Amino acid sequence: MAVYRLCVTTGSYLKAGTLDNIYATLVGTCGESPKQKLDRVGRDFATGSVQKYKVRCASELGEILLLRLHKERFAFFCKDPWYCSRICVTTPDGSVVHFPCYQWIDGYCTVELRPGTARTICQDALPLLLDHRKRELQARQECYRWKIYAPGFPRMVDVSSFEEMESDKKFALTKTAPCADQDDNSGNRYLPGFPMKVDIPSLLHMEPNIRYSATKTASLIFNALPASLGMKIRGLLDRKGSWKRLDDIRNIFWCHKTFTSEYVTEHWCEDSFFGYQYLNGVNPIMLHCLSSLPSKLPVTNDMVAPLLGPGTCLQTELERGHIFLADYWILAEAPVHCLNGRQQYVTAPLCLLWLNPQGVLLPLAIQLSQIPGPESPIFLPTDCELDWLLAKTWVRNSEFLVHENNTHFLCTHLLCEAFSMATLRQLPLCHPVYKLLLPHTRYTLQVNTIARATLLNPDGLVDKVTSIGRRGLIYLMSTGLAHFTYTDFCLPDSLRARGVLTIPNYHYRDDGLKIWAAIERFVSEIVSYYYPNDACVQQDSELQAWVGEIFAQAFLGRESSGFPSRLCTPGELVKYLTAIIFNCSAQHAAVNSGQHDFGAWMPNAPSSMRQPPPQTKGNTTMESYLETLPEVNTTCSNLLLFWLVSQEPKDQRPLGTYPDEHFTEEAPRQSIAAFQKCLAQISKDIRARNESLALPYAYLDPPLIENSVSI
């Protein structure tokens, strides 16, 4: 008689325990154990419990290959989900085999777990294990189906597949799903206290292993309801018309001020702060260094000489690499929307900036269209104060549109959703890349589903607050994806291509490069352990299918993007994985976490403009300026969004925090520890630097970076 000892850990999530009966079967190279009920005196599988059981066999089973968990009805009770964290099996000879699970087991079903040792498909020779990999991926591909949201968009998860799935029944992968414009919007309706419609049906069905935890859901609701209802009670969400005074905007979130939001309120109209935001604001990727001026921006030396001062000229500054351009060309043909029944306006400005001898980035000239001419004057710092302020505000509106739609939602949320989907569909649980990436996909499908149900849906928040509306959003994102490249995706390459490696006080760049290097070292150690040579990469059919699916579904097979459709060397794999992890974590933090800080003072980030851009100088008054800014209800609805997305709900997992132990080998565990130590040092350096800054930059402080796109 051989006795195997099982130590079963149930997760600590709310209602993670189960009343259902749990049975176990061990499968080894020499046979399998009888199906045996895991039962002991008292309550089994309670939330947070660690319990021990014995499985008896007539003889030893050899090397343990699989652990089958059978979940069946208990008495007359309804099915009860169970969150199994891990199971450790001690064999008769005393060796311990770890079986990571970390998933909800719903309904009455059988789940097969493999030992925690990561293995590529090339390392599996037994038909039993190869068949297990195949069946696991087939089941996941039936559960997680792709859907086309709009032409030119990265593909997304089809949440209707979760509604159709039952724990003991799977539906065909070939089932088609309609595009966004063909959806039945019967469930798209207003909820009390909220200013926009919500697509309720899409939120009701979410596969349990990708949905928010109860803690995170409660935290999100707790953040949203008081702020929204507070505005509703004060009548701000229903009040149309212009702001009477700029100072009135201060009172919207009087109880939700931060040090940075107050700093922005005091300094927003200063040229130095306008330039600062291109380096350390929420969209720090717009600047390109110029060696010559584009023909569409005919700025002359005489125009800017008063700002440049004696001893230099525009051509000299261009040659020195001190002139930079922010070009909003993508907005030139964006559709325009109506808000409160009134036509809104969009421009595609060109903003020229100069790095002065003191290392301060200053706006030098602004043209509010892509076509120069008499009706498109070039605004200068020497113009009338209100003319110059209005021109800068138009640029800030363009910043808002490009940042929210492309920098933020497209390049982090949507692309990371595609990475998550491909990982779930093409890599089995035992694959080393799956184990590496899974923590960086946590809650991404859920948060994007919420975004599509509240922001991108017809009459959602995008239609309620932006000058381009949902149609314009679709245009911007599809156009942005068509021009997005692998160089843009990889931080060091992007900084080099934009010529911004030497600008002083560029904290986003400095902190980002440190984090990139830390991730790269960590990933390199993991990859070198599992992929010692080129052949290991090239022969991993699952890895190649994963890369190919990302190329096809995220980047729509566009070869000009430069994204790989196949990986050939460990070095290529390291760079690719580093970029994915960085964008799922640090990049999202950099472009998301400061939205309330920089947007709470609405004139610094207006979501729409109600008057056409000025075609002459000298006509701007404070009254006309206020008439151009968004109306009261538009402002409040947008600031509500800023507040919510800047408040990371509870149940956070900072970058490098891996409480779910998917890797069980010593080498990757040591790499994780070294990664965490490196991040701790980066955090220490950032906090020391911030002590001497008038405006600290903390968005890339590792403890404040979430592992994944989860809000």
From Swiss-Prot:
Binds 1 Fe cation per subunit. GO terms for biological process: arachidonate metabolic process; ceramide biosynthetic process; establishment of skin barrier; fat cell differentiation; hepoxilin biosynthetic process; linoleic acid metabolic process; lipid oxidation; lipoxygenase pathway. The keyword Cytoplasm applies. Its EC number is 4.2.1.152, 5.4.4.7. Residues 119-711 form the Lipoxygenase domain. One of its GO terms (cellular component) is cytoplasm. One of its GO terms (molecular function) is hydroperoxy icosatetraenoate isomerase activity. It comes from Rattus norvegicus. Fe cation binds at H408, H413, H588, N592, I711. This is Hydroperoxide isomerase ALOXE3.
